[in-house]
Amino acid sequence: VLIVGERLNTTRKSVAAMVEALDGAAVRREALRQIEAGAHYVDVNAGTFRTREPELLRWMVESAQAVESAQAEEESAPIPLCIDSPNPVAIRAALEVHRGQAMVNSITGEAERLSRLLPVIRDHRSAVVALCLDDAGLPATADEATAKGLRLVETLLAAGIPPGDIYVDPVVRPVGADPGAAVTAIETIRLLRERLPEVHFICGLSNVSFGLPARSLANRGFAAMAMAAGLDAAILDPLDAPLMSALLAAEAVLGRDRHCGRYLRAYRQGKLT
């Protein structure tokens, strides 16, 4: 499972304080913590700053990818970041300073958003999270979500985005508000995986448990079922050790971990919990 660490988001008070104070070292430390915990990308979001979002999102990217010396830059690859914003201006500003391939979170089938974001994504050769959402709004059923997802992926492919750079998001909603939300998302992944075997499938894992107690437990249950349907990436808190352990276990059970190698290595390192 490809992990996108979700913690560098200014909706969290501690992160908002880092950004307000322009504490680049703190941003860098938070990004590194997530990579060390198993994240492959680190999500960066400055959306709560609204009018200052473009400049601050750009600054967050520079801070998270900062290196201490020219030698360090040569010896280590930059932390890959997931640029999280609905604002095309902010996304472009962040991509202009990002080193390596970024991921953009997210694009939809909404005509205006698609027309403004697609050239930016294509020009910077970014990976992209593609939401099963269009001008008609959120899908009510798995079949509707599948149709929206197929149309959006076809548009991305026609624009030259490689299938391996596309991460389809079924748009997971809280089961506390809609008891069928998780089932709909899982079925959407299954249906789209059959039609689009070369693209990836991702979701914001914690969305499913919003409003519930013991959220990590609900997240773990949903993750295993979604992975069985074809989910191969997730936006989550990599410092949630029980959740990360559950993902390793699910990969082993689903035959995605050759000879259970990653699971056994994590056990020997004392990381399973």
Language model: regions and residue ranges:
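Structural preference for beta-strand elements that scaffold enzyme active sites
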Residues: 1-3, 40-43, 78-82, 101-104, ...
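Active-site mouth loops of central-metabolism enzymes
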Residues: 3-29, 105-109, 135-144, 208-216
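Short, small-residue-enriched loops and turns at beta-alpha junctions
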Residues: 15, 46-53, 81, 88-89, ...
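Short, acidic/polar
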Residues: 23-34, 113, 149, 218-223
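Catalytic alpha/beta core domains of metabolic enzymes, predominantly
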Residues: 116, 123-271
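Active-site cofactor/substrate anionic-group-binding motifs, chiefly glycine-
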Residues: 25-26, 59-68, 73-111
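A cross-domain feature marking catalytic cores of carbohydrate-active enzymes
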Residues: 6-8, 44-46, 83-85, 106-108, ...
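Glycine-rich, proline-tolerant flexible connector loops at the mouths of alpha/beta enzymes
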Residues: 35-68, 75-82, 170-182
